[in-house]
Amino acid sequence: MVCVGIDVAKDKHDCFIISSEGEILADVFTIPNNAEGFDTLLQAIRRSTRPEDKIKVGLEATGHYSYNILGFLLDKGLPTYVINPLHTNLYRKSLSLRKTKTDRVDARTIAAMLMSDVDLKSYTDTAYH
């Protein structure tokens, strides 16, 4: 399995790709919050995986800043998990006593959460009437 952690921000996203064995496939890299950046992310995922690999992509729920990348990932058929920022914060604190909070650390934390949390449910765009 390959896990992709994305820390979403207004103008840019920090991304991190790791295998379930703990091998870093792509250390933290930054993409712009636009179609070109999303294509760069998709290329990095494809370079880091084999066709038989199961892929999980996780990002924090950050309101409207995450809508475009979330839509892109879903359109590409990637299982995507939208994680409550409170859970990310608590998970990060459980891993370290340091008060380290950076976008780079968050991207790694989100990927680690995907590897360890079997209770996460992938995002579905369901409308109820």
Positions of the model-derived regions?
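Phosphate- and other anionic-substrate recognition elements at nucleic-acid/protein interfaces
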Residues: 1-129
